[in-house]
UniProtKB/Swiss-Prot annotation:
Originating organism: Homo sapiens (Human)
Chain's gene name: FAM90A5
More details: Primate-specific FAM90A gene family, thought to have arisen during multiple duplication and rearrangement events.
Protein family (similarity comment): Belongs to the FAM90 family.
InterPro entries for the chain: FAM90, Znf-CCHC_6
Bias (Basic and acidic residues) ranges: 74-89, 97-114
Stretches for region Disordered: 16-42, 70-389, 415-437
Biased composition (Low complexity): 180-197
Name of the protein in question: Protein FAM90A5
Length: 464
């Protein structure tokens, strides 16, 4: 009996049973909401609203009767944005009202400043406020005042200058500026230092004897023109002030009124021996190979280019213009090696610009022919042999090229004369033009020449 059953009928029965089970289980599951109810999880694709789908009858795109019409807000009379909002109460002003109040206060604060400026430039008296407290200042008032040409009165604001000092100070500053323009940096420094010091503190004896107008009106002329006994060579020169004693003696005759304005400042009177020998017979001049001394006072000439340096103790071509002859000389060592006592002259004890002899760039026209080397013996300087130190013996030779060479020789020590008057009797004056084979030259002249050459080398080494 079991074999006779049809398999197809068996399959149909299973399908029917499964469908019946599904129908029975359906009420147990979640029910779909009716089409009229809103579901926030749904979104319409047509109108973009939530709660219904595109097929729902609630969509306004399908049912135009239920669509909302935009309501009009009403029209205002007049133009739009004429009064966009009502002003708030002043008791509680907003941020916009605060900004307006600050803008109104700023021009009120600037009004006194404008009045002060107008009074300063126009010179008109300030306006008095009205008794009711309301000022008559309008924006048009400022425009009226500024539009026309305003007179500027600067006489009241300009600092008053003493009429006595007005002429001299202006001329002095202009002339001094023109003099400074033609000087080298080293000379400008010396000029500024000497001008800053008072008349009693200046240590340049040569510049102290000159009156103040000499700096103003000489221009490119030499600051100190000292006339020796014979004729002075003409042409452009580079002058350096000589010793204080010589300048003082010559300037008294040339410029008697200079002493009233500016007296000479010297620590001690110069010894009569050096004064006599330097003031009457000597006219020292350096040749083209000479060096400019490091401690030179005010100079108002042009700065010439440097020449090649010579030996440490070498004297230039025209070291002794009066004698023109070489002479071994007994000299005292430099002041650093000896003690400086009361008997030492200021030229030996103090290295001031007054120790430097004058410099002449132009050699004399007529000069006798000299042998290669000549020598003579000279007595020792009384002021230099203060402590009895061993003196130096220097031999000066005249070279073929017109220059001088020096060499140190050992010399026995001897006692110098006690009085300066004895030195005057032993050392005659230097003649103008030498004709004898040997001429005695005062030792102070050669000592100053050596000191100038050594100081110039020290200054060049410091600059390099």
């Amino acid at each position: 009996m079991m074999a006779r059953r049809d398999p197809t009928s068996w399959a149909k029965r299973l399908v029917r049973a499964q469908t019946l089970q599904k129908q029975r289980r359906a009420p147990v599951g979640p029910r779909a909401p009716p089409p009229d109810e809103e579901d926030p999880r749904l979104k319409c694709k047509n109108c973009g609203a939530f709660g219904h789908t595109a097929r729902s009858t609630r969509c306004p795109m399908k049912c135009w009767k239920a669509a909302l019409v935009p309501a009009t807000l009403g029209k205002k009379e007049g133009k739009e944005n004429l009064k966009p909002w009502k002003p708030r109460v002043e008791a509680n002003p907003g941020p916009l009202n605060k900004d307006k109040g600050e803008k109104e206060e700023r021009p009120r604060q600037q009004d006194p400043q404008r009045k002060a400026l107008l009074h300063m430039f126009s010179g008109k008296p300030p306006e008095k406020p009205l008794p009711n407290g309301k000022g008559s200042t309008e924006p048009s008032d400022y425009l009226r005042v500024a539009s026309g040409p305003m007179p500027v009165h600067t006489t009241s604001k300009r600092p008053r200058v003493d009429p006595v000092l007005a002429d001299g100070s202006a001329t002095e500053m202009s002339d001094r500026g023109s003099v400074l323009a033609s000087l080298s940096p080293l000379r400008k420094a010396s000029l500024s230092s000497s001008s800053s010091l008072g008349p009693k503190e200046r240590q340049t004896g040569a510049a102290a004897d000159m009156p103040q107008p000499a700096v103003r009106h000489q221009g490119r002329e030499p600051l100190l023109v000292v006339k020796p006994t014979h004729s002075r060579p003409e042409g452009g020169c580079r002058e350096v002030p000589q010793a204080a004693s010589k300048t003082h003696g010559l300037l008294q005759a040339a410029r008697p009124q200079a002493q009233d304005k500016r007296p000479a400042v010297t620590s001690q009177p110069c010894p009569p021996a050096a004064t006599h020998s330097l003031g009457l017979g000597s006219n020292l001049s350096f040749g083209p190979g000479a060096k400019r001394p490091a401690q030179a006072p005010i100079q108002a000439c042009l700065n010439f280019p440097k020449k090649p340096r010579l030996g440490p103790f070498q004297i230039p071509e025209s070291a002794i213009q009066g004698g023109e002859l070489g002479a071994p000389e007994n000299l005292q060592p430099p002041p650093a090696a000896t003690e400086l006592g009361p008997s030492t002259s200021p030229q030996m004890g103090r290295r001031t610009p007054a120790q430097v002899p004058s410099v002449d760039r132009q050699p004399p026209h007529s000069r006798p022919c000299l042998p290669t080397a000549q020598a003579c013996t000279m007595s020792h300087h009384p002021a230099a042999s203060h402590d009895g130190a061993q003196p130096l013996r220097v031999l000066f030779r005249r070279l073929e090229n017109g220059r001088w060479s020096s060499s140190l020789l050992a010399a026995p020590s001897f006692h110098s004369p006690e009085k300066p008057g004895a030195f005057l009797a032993q050392s005659p004056h230097v003649s103008e033009k030498s004709e004898a084979p040997c001429v005695r030259v005062p030792p102070s002249v050669l000592y100053e020449d050596l000191q100038v050459s050594s100081s110039s080398e020290d200054s060049d080494s410091d600059l390099e």
